[in-house]
Amino acid sequence: MKEFIFPMKIYWEEKDKNYGRFVVEPLERGYGTTIGNALRRVLLSSIYGSAITAVKIEGVQHEFSTIEGVQEDVLQIIANLKNVRFDLKDSDLEILYLEKNAPGVVLASDIKTPPNVTIINKDAYIATINSANTTLKMEIRIERGKGYVMSDEMEQIGEAGWVVLDADFSPIKVAAFRVEATRVGDRTDYDKLTFELTTNGVVSPDTAIQQAVELIVKHMNMLTNISYEVPTLPEPMPPDELMEKLTFSIEELDISQRALNSLKRIGVTTIGELVQLTEDELKSSKNIGRKALTEIKEALKNMGFSLGMNIGEQRSSEV
């Protein structure tokens, strides 16, 4: 019986801080495409990075404004800000500040950052101030995340003047591969996989590959012990226990800090207050995005609750 072939050569053909190309050979026929596709999909969708998610410019109410004494309009300034690359560590969110009150070019290096935030491309252009009487002052919210997130899925900010942005968190700019035939002994129908990727400089190519492989292996390992169990329905919670949970703080909900902050901004402090709100009422609040709403509904479901409940009816059913 023919032995299964495993790779004998795995090496980087070229690698620097932004670009890398490596080779894996030989592989059984079809495995080049299988491995290449898996790596590419995980790299583009699941590697964490940092991005600007909202900006507040002093004196500006919306993104279609202009700023007297500044060459660019707000839309162009936002587009330029999106080109600034950040490395955010030990935190999921930070607010950065920029203030410039002299004529000249405004660069990413003018942004004030805490110790856990590094600007990768400090020479990135943001705007030009043309007037000595103009001050460009802004707050910039950056967050960690993965993939591409639309602005309506972001945590909304109730305070006036903030513009919430679409965010491309992925540090991977290009991920591509090709599969060629390679020889093992007399056979020439084995695969040679050549994979290349370009990052934005926040992560190196080898680190990105390592993270992607670890994610794939972790998922595959979970499939080594497949068992089928008929799901059992949870025992219904006693009414008095349900009523007690209604008095709990929303801090008890298994939701992200982002979703928790969104609820606090609209004045919700207890689970009882939350369950009396309908889904439409939460949707109509600019503080609650689609992602936060999904988290809230799932957390309530796990506790035996749902949105739009009539607590009065619940109490009367106990009597």
UniProtKB/Swiss-Prot annotation:
GO terms for molecular function: DNA binding; DNA-directed RNA polymerase activity; protein dimerization activity. GO terms for cellular component: cytoplasm; DNA-directed RNA polymerase complex. Keywords: DNA-directed RNA polymerase, Nucleotidyltransferase, Transcription, Transferase. GO terms for biological process: DNA-templated transcription. The keyword Transcription applies. It is an enzyme of class 2 (transferase). Pfam families: RNA_pol_A_bac, RNA_pol_A_CTD, RNA_pol_L. Its EC number is 2.7.7.6. Coiled coil: none annotated. Residues 1-227 are annotated as: Alpha N-terminal domain (alpha-NTD). It catalyses: RNA(n) + a ribonucleoside 5'-triphosphate = RNA(n+1) + diphosphate. Residues 242-319 are annotated as: Alpha C-terminal domain (alpha-CTD). HAMAP family: RNApol_bact_RpoA. The N-terminal domain is essential for RNAP assembly and basal transcription, whereas the C-terminal domain is involved in interaction with transcriptional regulators and with upstream promoter elements. Homodimer. The RNAP catalytic core consists of 2 alpha, 1 beta, 1 beta' and 1 omega subunit. When a sigma factor is associated with the core the holoenzyme is formed, which can initiate transcription. DNA-dependent RNA polymerase catalyzes the transcription of DNA into RNA using the four ribonucleoside triphosphates as substrates. Belongs to the RNA polymerase alpha chain family. This is DNA-directed RNA polymerase subunit alpha. The lineage of its organism: Bacteria, Pseudomonadati, Aquificota, Aquificia, Aquificales.
